């Protein structure tokens, strides 16, 4: 279909535009992008191993694969392709705000998934095809790790999912704490040591290289929000006063999957390059100096989010509580 389309349709053909718009609609619904995102948070009610498989690695990202596989059609309808990037940019920022006010540990990860798929849509919209699939792969590693680790937390806390009823768990479940640190660092794209940094940086570089500065800025805003809500969750769950007596998981069946995914969430996972040569078009590359500038900027943004999260939820918890109970805070939480 993709190969035959250029012989039968001219670029910008109305029928082709409607076809790609319908494909985009299916991808948006499948991958929980705005405005068809409402189902994803409720889907988190399933067991965490299921979430680790279908919400981190396979089912929810199928919309990304659909657009990447039919890229030839979208290249013939540049207006629809640009719309893909806009939807991704809006989704990644809005989902970041939503994750910042969640109290259920799995819902934080649900909105995080929505936001990260927004990055993939942004990459597709700026023709950074390889970067979209690369981030799909690295996201599968660290998000599966976070979902499995969250399941371990929930079981250790007697099926409690409210993060504000936890606290101080780093001493009772140290392996899971390490998993959250590694997975959270990868999700936040901590520079050089995590797989998420390399894939997310490729997306931002693709946006800049193709002249989509506004989408690149949205990606940087999303990166700040990501590190903020991720380490908010980690600091609330694992630091502070212990509120519940947790029972650590035992045995190789519990430890081994977490350890394997921890390793793949580091820079080791970024060494696994998907064999996409000849499958997807080449992406425009930035000059080396501009790449370095972008890497430093995105790294500073990620670290700034982590430091602010530490300042707010490790040092100024009363300030956060007062803001949350204020009229603007309640309005933001409702929104």
What are the roles of these predicted feature ranges?
Residues 197, 247, 278, 320-322:
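Short coil/turn segments at secondary-structure boundaries
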Residues 4, 33, 255, 272-273, ...:
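Selective for proline/serine-rich intrinsically disordered segments
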Residues 254-264, 283-335:
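Membrane-interface and transmembrane segments of multi-pass membrane proteins
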Residues 1-250, 262-271:
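Hydrophobic transmembrane alpha-helices and their helix-loop junctions in integral membrane proteins
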Residues 4-7, 169, 207, 279, ...:
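Residues that form generic nucleotide/phosphate-binding pockets
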Residues 268-274, 311-314:
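Membrane-interface helix-loop junctions at the exits of transmembrane helices
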Residues 74, 167, 279-286, 332:
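Generic preference for hydrophobic/aromatic residues in regular secondary structure cores
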Residues 247, 270-293:
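Polyanionic (Asp/Glu-rich) segments that form extended negatively charged tracts
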């Amino acid at each position: 279909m993709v190969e035959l389309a250029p012989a039968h349709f001219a670029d910008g053909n109305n029928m082709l535009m409607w076809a790609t718009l319908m494909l985009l609609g299916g991808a948006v619904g499948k991958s929980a992008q705005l405005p068809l995102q409402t189902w994803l948070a409720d889907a988190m009610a399933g067991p965490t191993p299921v979430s680790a498989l279908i919400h981190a690695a396979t089912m929810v990202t199928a919309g990304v694969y659909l657009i990447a596989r039919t890229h030839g059609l979208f290249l013939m309808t540049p207006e629809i392709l640009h719309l893909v990037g806009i939807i991704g940019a809006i989704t990644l920022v809005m989902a970041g705000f939503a994750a910042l006010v969640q109290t259920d540990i799995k819902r934080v990860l649900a909105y995080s998934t929505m936001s990260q798929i927004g990055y993939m849509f942004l990459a597709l919209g700026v023709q950074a095809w390889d970067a979209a699939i690369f981030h799909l792969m690295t996201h599968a590693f660290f998000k599966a790790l976070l979902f499995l680790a969250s399941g371990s937390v929930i079981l250790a806390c007697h099926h409690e999912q409210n993060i504000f009823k936890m606290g101080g768990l780093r001493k009772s479940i140290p392996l899971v704490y390490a998993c959250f640190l590694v997975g959270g660092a990868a999700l936040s794209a901590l520079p050089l040591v995590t797989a998420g940094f390399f894939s997310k940086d490729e997306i931002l570089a693709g946006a800049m290289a193709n002249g989509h500065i506004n989408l690149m800025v949205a990606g940087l805003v999303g990166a700040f929000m990501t590190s903020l809500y991720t380490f908010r969750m980690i600091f609330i769950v694992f630091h502070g006063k212990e509120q519940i007596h947790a029972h650590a998981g035992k045995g190789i069946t519990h430890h081994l999957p977490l350890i394997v995914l921890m390793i793949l969430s580091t820079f080791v996972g970024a060494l696994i390059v998907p064999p996409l040569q000849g499958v997807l078009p080449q992406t425009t590359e930035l000059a080396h100096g501009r790449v370095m500038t972008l890497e430093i900027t995105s790294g500073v943004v990620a670290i700034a989010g982590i430091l602010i999260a530490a300042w707010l939820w490790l040092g100024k918890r009363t300030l956060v509580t007062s803001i949350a109970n204020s009229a603007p805070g309640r309005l933001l939480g409702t929104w």
